[in-house]
Each structure stands twice: as C-alpha cells, then as structure tokens.
Amino acid sequence: MSDRIDRDVINALIAGHFADPFSVLGMHQTTAGLEVRALLPDATEVWVIEPKTGRKVGKLECIDSRGFFSGVLPRRKNFFRYQLAVVWHGQQNLIDDPYRFGPLIQEMDAWLLSEGTHLRPYETLGAHADTMDGVTGTRFSVWAPNAQRVSVVGQFNYWDGRRHPMRLRKESGIWELFIPGAQHGQLYKFEMIDAHGKLRIKADPYAFEAQMRPETASLICGLPEKVVQTEERKQANRFDAPVSIYEVHLGSWRRHTDNNFWLSYRELADQLIPYVKWMGFTHLELLPVNEHPFDGSWGYQPTGLYAPTRRFGTRDDFRYFINAAHQAGLNVILDWVPGHFPSDDFGLADFDGTKLYEHSDPREGYHQDWNTLIYNYGRREVSNYLVGNALYWIERFGIDALRVDAVASMIYRDYSRKEGEWIPNEFGGRENLEAIEFLRNTNRILGEQVSGAVSMAEESTDFAGVSRPQDMGGLGFWYKWNLGWMHDTLDYMKLDPVHRQYHHDKLTFGMLYNYTENFVLPLSHDEVVHGKKSILDRMPGDAWQKFANLRAYYGWMWAFPGKKLLFMGNEFAQGREWNHDASLDWHLLEGGDNWHHGVQRLVRDLNHTYRHHKALHELDFDAYGFEWLVVDDNERSVLIFVRRDKVGNEIIVASNFTPVPRHDYRFGINQPGKWREIVNTDSMHYHGSNTGNGGVVHSDEIASHGRQHSLSLTLPPLATIWLVREGE
C-alpha cells in the first residue's frame, strides 16, 4: 500500500484523539491508486461495494486489529459512490460510509454563524434529517471551537466515540458529520476531547427534543414546520387591545388524583384551555417549558433551550396544545430565560473545556443567587444562539409573545453583588452593555421578522425606557411588568383598614410614572411562594373581610391602567401558597356555593366586562384614558377615577377600602346623565353584603370637586364598583 498512513495517526484515530478524520478516512487518491480507508471497530471483514450492481469492487485489508481497514481499488481511477459490506460477529451489514460525503455547511451559513448574524442558526446547527447523494440520514453539527476532537455518539453506533468523529470547519469552529441511517427518534450526544484533553459528553445545545430528567440525551427530531401568524393573534397583542393573562405552571395546575402525576400536553389542551377561555382571559402565559433537569427551578434553569420538556409529552404534543389555545382564541406567552443556565455537566457549562457560553471570570459569569452561569452576550455566537431561539419559538411553535425573565439581573453587572464581587464595564459603569445590546437586538429582530409578536420584560429596577424603542435609547420591549405597582398595592391591601388612610399614596403613586412605560400589572407566581403567603392570606381581617378585600382589590386592578396578569389559583382565592409538586386546591370549589366560587365568578365577570368596554383598555398608555375624580379622600380611604376610550366614552370606578359603607357619597363627574352599575364586588353574586345602588343612578346638577354635575352613591364596604353611562 502506497502513501501508508502513519502508525501514530492510526493510534490517535482509534484512541479518539485525531482531529481531522476526513484526511484519513473515506476515499482518497494515492500514488498507488484510489484507496478507501475505514475505522470499523469489531469488524472482521470489509468489502467495497458498487451500489448500482451490488458487485464487490475490492476488499479492504485489516491494518490494525482494533478496526482500521484500508485497500487500493484495482482498475478504478475516478471517485465514485460506494458502500461498505461489513462483517460483524458473523453477520454482514451493508452501510454507507459517512466519510465519502463532502462539507455540509454552506460557506454563507458558516460566515453568518461566525459573525453572529445568522437569523435562524437552528436551521443549520443541531441534528437535521437529510438526503445526500441519494442516501438518507441525519446531518449533525455543533459549535465547539476549542475541542480537540468531537464525535457523534448514539443508539446508531453503540455510543462509541471512535466510530463517528466529525469534521472541523476551522473558519467557524463548527464540527459536522452526516451519518447515513441515523433516524428520527434515536438518542444522541456529542462526545469530545476538550481543550484540556478531558473527555466530555454533551447534549446538543440545538436539540429539538430531549430526554426527561434524570436522562439527558438529545433526540433526533426534525425541525418543526412553521406556524402562520394570523391577523387576529397579532391584533390581540396591540397596545389598545384587552390583555388579560392567566399565568400557568403546567406541572401543577391540575394533577391526576390517583397518583399525583402531571397532566399531559393533550390533557391540558382538553382541560386547561376551555377553562381559561370560559374565565374570559385573553392570553395564556406558560412558565418555561424548555427542558430542565430540576423540577424545583420551575423551568427557570433550562438546559434544552430548543426542546419543550418531555414531562408532559412530545414536541408535537406541545404544538397540539398551542394550536388548541389558538383555536380557542387565546394567545400564548412563553416565559423565556436568556439570562442564565445551570452548571450541569451535560449542558453548556465548560462546553468544549473552555468558558464558551459563559464568562471565564466568575464575577461576570456566575450567578450567586441561583448557582447558575451567565451567558457571555459579547460573544457573537452566544448571542446568536439566544436570538435564534426567540425566533424559533415564535416561528416554529406559534408562540405569540415572550416574557423575558429577570431582566435586571442581565443588564446590571452588580446585580445582587457586593463591592469587589463584580467588574465594571469598559466605561467604569455598572451596566452590562453587552446584555443591553443583546436585548435591543433581539427585540429589533422580532419586530422585523415576526411583526405582531411581542416581548415583555420582568424588570425590577427603574432602568429607563425598558418598553421604549431602541432609537429612543430604550430596550425595545413592547411591555414591562409593573413590579412597583404590585408591591405598593399589596403593601396597602395587607394593612388593617384603620391604618390605610396613612398610606393612601401607595394606591395613587403608580399614576405618577404610569406613562413612562407600557405596563402589565402582575400578580405572578413570585408573589405566592417562599413565605409570602397567598394573595388571599395577605388580606387583613376575618374570613369575610379577607374575601371582601380581595374582591375590592381585583376590581381596582382590572380597572387601573395597564394590562392584567393573574397567576393560577388566585382566580378562586386559593388559601395556601403555590406548591409546584401538587395540584391547585380545586377541592375548594367542590360542594356548595362558597366564597371561592364568588371570587371565581368575579374574576370571570371582570374579564368579560373589561374586554367588552374599550374605555378599560384602549388608552392604557395615553393620559387621555384616565382621570382622577377623587384622589385625596384618605380619611375615608375612598378613591374614584374615570377610564376613557378614544371617542370619550367613560367608565367610573369607585373603591372604598374600609369596612364602613359610605352612603350619599357625592363627587363631581364630567358627563351628566344616567349611570348603570356594571360591577359591584360586594354583590351577593360574589358572596358580598349586597350593598349598592340598585343598578342605576342619575346625576345631579350639583357642583362638586370643581365640576358642575355630580353623582351621589352608596359605596359598599371593602368594595369596588364600576359604572357606565347609558344616556342623558
């Protein structure tokens, strides 16, 4: 044999330490002629086969008993398609040689991936079914620029890293290989010799499906088809649309009563979605569904950013669930976690032996609160991985909005860190400039590529312009959670009513900054865990007063400017904190009609009334849409305001946050006439005392509060009422 392969190369190849397998394996032109080489551990005999005729072209000689074969093909001068007939343990198998195929990734894709500007990197990286030269199989690719060798291991090769070492594309740091016969549903991982010579086995960062914990392999699974954005779904996200969000943790909304096991995606489609629709919500927000190893993280520590968790079924089951939501007229919001990732060995941590996805300095790359790692947004390939993921969920699953978790932890380098535990940016400041640019870029691309889909920020500081356009210096989100409103109002509501007069500003302060952002008013999962108590249990007083306070608060919230968000269980006043390992307390709604039914009916009525009246949602972010009528009656803890639509139709909202009914309470109004009470949280329908105004009241030409006309109302105890004008 001429051009004999060096024994050291064979040893390195068999040991799994050779970085350029295509320079050795496959078909090569040598001085002796056309030569085929193959590494086939445990094989005893190998023939080169002509596929069209099935004729044996030549036999490969066993050069090394560990499985290295080579042979020159007589009378063959030009490259041709071939197969290998391999005898393993007495059985002959006909296989296609992975090393006869050329480079997989197109030069333009490789360049865009290296530049970090490939809009859809998941279409190139990961595992994709393909047909090459008439051969079906799967093409694999993974970014690991500092690895010494990378192999695909899986069910198709006995998890043996010697059998399928990959080709390194040095210009991009991407390893690639087409494996004939690797099929949909088979498990795989990437085995690599890392930068320090250590053996690592990693799940695919771009896997479209993965095993459920405690198993960690990726699944070969084709790229899901695109989901068309409908005009109705786009309209439902608009600033002037009614947006009422039901936030759900799929693993604990409801469970099987016999074994406490989760409902599947399809069972949730049959049970959860009709319930959310019946309750009148417009949007369904899901706590993260990305694959994650630790149940107690609620999904906020993902390892499979492109894979829906298998806890509740397959990827196609999840697509079925989303489609069912759309068919019911619900938009779907996905909690998205681009801020950090866990340090599990099979995940992104130390991916190729270097800090590839994270920062090398723990003062930048380690999150102390959650024991997680922070993405290095300044590395183009990393930010591209994340931006592509945002598009992936919207385009390939039909997600209508992304709610970005823990934005403050991303944009501040000193977040939850003491002096000396963080590194300033290049200008000496505390802002994470790379994270800010990443968020702006992500939102810009969403606006350009999937117009109508939106993003929402959970941002807990006063960072300016979170929901303002990038060209105005903002981050470009469409909406921001108003955590200040949430804290202030809950702090107010937990007070004994006798003390509320001294904290009146906690309910009024929100309007001083209301138009600085496009706000969502959130009563989220974070407010019913870790000893904070349930929303109901924070209310003061005896049982009657607790429920009355809660109903009054909900009436206030649904009328206040801003979109609405309510975590599951709060809609029927669950008494205990949320437990991710158990179902909600649905038994509270069993038996006879009770206070919990009353709250549930109220939330349903609030949703339907809110959606019906444009004054309650059309001008959330326009000062014309809100006006105080009574803002200074702190002694009686009464607040009254007007909500207004674009053409001037008004709804009056009056709240009495004391247990004392206020009879003949007069206040000035803008529009005289007949006003109908459309919501009264003290109604007997909601198990209140049924104090009210008999349905209809008429204005008087009596001046009050600087206005010529006024209304005289009975304000029920611990209640909120809404009134709509019906005419002169």
Swiss-Prot record:
SUPFAM superfamilies to which the protein is assigned, alphabetical: (Trans)glycosidases (SSF51445), E set domains (SSF81296), Glycosyl hydrolase domain (SSF51011)
E.C. no: 2.4.1.18
Functional summary from the UniProt entry: Catalyzes the formation of the alpha-1,6-glucosidic linkages in glycogen by scission of a 1,4-alpha-linked oligosaccharide from growing alpha-1,4-glucan chains and the subsequent attachment of the oligosaccharide to the alpha-1,6 position.
Family to which this protein belongs: Belongs to the glycosyl hydrolase 13 family. GlgB subfamily.
Protein's UniProt keywords contain Glycosyltransferase: yes
Top EC category: transferase
Protein name from the UniProt record: 1,4-alpha-glucan branching enzyme GlgB
Subunit text: Monomer.
GO molecular-function terms, A-Z: 1,4-alpha-glucan branching enzyme activity; cation binding; hydrolase activity, hydrolyzing O-glycosyl compounds
Recorded catalytic activity of this chain's protein: Transfers a segment of a (1->4)-alpha-D-glucan chain to a primary hydroxy group in a similar glucan chain
Active site: 405 (nucleophile), 458 (proton donor)
Gene: glgB
UniProt-listed Pfam families: Alpha-amylase (PF00128), Alpha-amylase_C (PF02806), CBM_48 (PF02922), GlgB_N (PF22019)
Entry's Gene Ontology BP terms: glycogen biosynthetic process
Alphabetic keyword roster: Carbohydrate metabolism, Glycogen biosynthesis, Glycogen metabolism, Glycosyltransferase, Transferase
UniProt cross-references to InterPro entries, sorted A to Z: A-amylase/branching_C, Branching_enzy, GlgB, GlgB_N, GlgB_N_E_set_prok, Glyco_hydro_13_cat_dom, Glyco_hydro_13_N, Glyco_hydro_b
Keyword Transferase: yes
The species this protein was found in: Citrobacter koseri (strain ATCC BAA-895 / CDC 4225-83 / SGSC4696)
Database matches in HAMAP family: GlgB
Biological pathway: Glycan biosynthesis; glycogen biosynthesis
Gene3D superfamilies: Glycosidases, Golgi alpha-mannosidase II, Immunoglobulins
GO CC field: cytosol
Superkingdom, taxonomy of origin: Bacteria
